[in-house]
Amino acid sequence: MKAQDTLTVMQYNLLYYGNYQSGYADCYETNNNTQQKDEYIRTILDYVKPDIFTVCEFGSTATLHNDFLRHNLNIGSTNYWQTDNILNYANSNIINHIFFDSRKLGMKKHVALRTTPRDTDIYELYLKTPGLAAGDTTKLICIVAHLKAGNTASDRKKRLNQMQTTMYYVSQHYSKDNVLIMGDFNLYGASEDTYKLLTQTYSDPDALFKDPLYEVGGVGEWTYNSQFAAFHTQATRRYSEECFSAGGLDDRFDFIMMSYEVAYGYDHLRYVRNSYKAVGNDGKHYNQSVNQGSNTAVPTAVADALYGCSDHLPVTMKIFADVSVGVDETTEPDLMAFVAPNPVKDYARVSFYNPKHGNVQFDLYSLQGQLLQRTTEAFDEGPQQFELSLQDQPQGFYLLKITHSNGWRQTVKVVIK
């Protein structure tokens, strides 16, 4: 992988790929044929060209992931796609899985959390960068989850329980890392407790995720709501055809969320703004099939493949990687900023190292990126402390961006109780 590169990530619910044993939702080989799906998948992969490809509703047969590699990824002269062994503690007939470009990425670890109704899979990847041999490792954690379907109180509670287990694991192991959480979340709106847990209410602010669609108006009560037509991911078909859900595009069930490390590029990886897409959603197919008439988002062959392969659309995003080696570290001094104690009440005691006499600006942001207050003070060189008044701010989670007049900056998370 080059010192500066861009990774494309794709998450896709493959609709009972390679599994017919249960007849789930009337899905059989006759109406959800794996060989036919492979043709559609190859068309979609050739269009998106992902570097990381995560999936839900993948059959749990032991050899299926190798067959998938051979038929869809490592074809012709291509031989660099890899995957990992299946873990399936829940003994489900459909599982999550991952495929990745081994020229750019390696896998250090795969953990499956014992959640209900299916395992939550955590893949710890690392970038194969120029500095890797010297021990300079940049990690990217991909968490793939398929939450309980349905909109009853019991369904919502099961989704919440699964993500509470997951968030605790993130808090304990990956709270300062580059993390993506993706999958079919079956969420009906941003007011659902599970969505709020992931983005706002979990007790450890370092474990929270950011929804890439917040900044472009994609967060709200999206189900059966034409105002969110550009963001829906299900269903690809207007009319019921046994295995496939019907109704056209009117739900946002499929997600990739990112840790704030990825959102703001704290650790060599940074989300490319406005790169998040539901592949094939042109905003003009609300309650319609994705290939009805013309589709301005993708070529006709891709729209037809999306219609044929699954009742979900894949979602994608791009991540810029800057892992340059040999940089003079003195050009970017570490402010070593932290807030302690944290949570805070009326004031935040900010400790930091000032590399050079000058003005330092303190900007407080909401988790959604809204600037709430700005304070600027002059500081001498050396260790510093500053009492930042937060009396006008309600309880919640915030981001404090600290910027020196020379351009050196750092962002820390703050909890007001």
Name every feature range the model reports, one short phrase each.
Residues 364-372, 398:
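Short, glycine-anchored, charge-dense loop/turn motifs used at functional sites
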Residues 379-381, 395-417:
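C-terminal tail/sorting-segment detector
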Residues 4-324:
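Divalent cation-coordinating acidic motifs and surrounding scaffolds
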Residues 322-340, 355, 370-372:
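Residue-level detector of functionally pivotal "anchor" positions at catalytic/ligand-binding pockets or at interdomain
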Residues 358-361:
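Short beta-strand/loop motifs in extracellular/secreted proteins, especially
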Residues 121, 382-388:
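Short strand-edge motifs at loop-to-beta-strand transitions and within beta-strands
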Residues 348-354:
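Aromatic/hydrophobic beta-strand junction motif of beta-rich domains
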Residues 345, 356, 381, 394-395:
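Surface-exposed loops/turns
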